[in-house]
Amino acid sequence: MLDLNIQNETSRLRTVVLGTAFHNGPIPTIEECYDPKSKIHVIAGTYPKEQDMIFEMESVARVFEKYGIKVFRPKVIENYNQIFSRDIGFVIEDKFITANILPDRDLEISAIDHVLGQIPKENRISLPEDCHVEGGDVMPWNNYIFIGTYSGKDYPEYITARTNVNAVKAIQELFPTKIVKSFELRKSNDNAKENALHLDCCFQPIGKDKAILHKNGFLIEEEFLWLVDFFGKENIFEISKDEMYQMNSNVFSISENIIVSEQNFTRLNTWLVEKGFTVEKVTYAEIAKQEGLLRCSTLPLVRD
């Protein structure tokens, strides 16, 4: 059986689900796109090729192998996008919470049945149907759980709004001893530079006390400033709108001092090295065309 343990975003990783790009399916139509960035690349004819995405994901698998991390992969479903495993579930403490994701993506959950079957039933949780949540919006951080959400009355109109207030309340009830802190995110169905698809598109804690942050991803300035105060301005790497668009905040921590990052994130990677991090650079620019990167395509199950 799997002894799940996730207390935060950066303790030493031991076991993870990494998505797969095999048999990813045809290029979607504009109507089939779930996010504005994918739409841009469908229209431009630059939507990523399957072989390029496979190459990128296997390079991440090799990094995990280098550090002795146990890696699970989803069972491959023909003609189906299974890259972003973070969307389908998440772990807090010893509980696996199945995400209530977009209906078109339900098959993704069945593709990790071989993983879920190793988790005790009492530790597998499905939230009520009216609780919409995806793993990219949920960040355990020791005594806190940070959650990205959108509470506007026009929530149903945004395919980019993935986590609702009902889910925030449900997670607080599941973990009564944790401090659940929610953040209203900026949403756009059409402008990728004005859209924080998930919380990890504009924020991520790294190391012991540092964070990557993009101000415009937050609808309410006070909530952005709360994070600045929480981590301390000197510990924050603030990214520009273009860097947010390129997914700079969506790196992935193997430990408190080892981070997997995209090789083209020059400014961020330089800062990370200056701060004492080991940076494992990979090519992930094709995956990024679907408005997701390294954190989005990983689902940590066990950390120290």
Can you annotate each of these PLM segments?
Residues 1-304:
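The feature marks the mature, well-folded catalytic cores of soluble enzymes
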